[in-house]
């Protein structure tokens, strides 16, 4: 899986700057220079190649991927008070500090979500670079399954939110349980007011 490859790469390679790019010919390589410059000269810890602010929604022919990207981005930015414009992009640059402090837990495509949350939670410097996006070449099929991998990503967000912000996670869970209890209690209470019986 993708996460396993990233784990081994980060463990075995020592460098001042790392670039991660998907091998499906959807990301133009020329944006790499600007991303590397931000890491080496401006001490940025993670540079995010932002597809969503340029050509992604025009080029990508998979509508549920578009919806999923927007959902994941909105959820993470809301829960973690961040402003990462493209959570799921496979085009990123990293500093040595990021790579050597990142505990790779995911095995598959949810790795990008984990990277984004790690950087935000550790107060690392994150910047976005708007990049062009091309749809996959004809005959090239994505290994990403919209539904099963989408569910894994949402599950990863929930797990990491619980680990990084337990008060917020269990506070929301408690509020939900209180709401359910109140809904179940109201009919019983109304019956009691009318009849005096429970």
Annotated model-derived regions:
Residues 34, 81, 105-107, 111-198:
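Hydrophobic helical membrane-anchoring modules
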Residues 21-22, 130:
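Short beta-strand segments
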Residues 2-13, 17-20, 29-109, 135-151:
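Acceptor/aglycone-binding surface of glycosyltransferases and processive sugar-polymer synthases
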Residues 25-26:
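Acidic metal-phosphate-binding loop of nucleotide-sugar-dependent transferases
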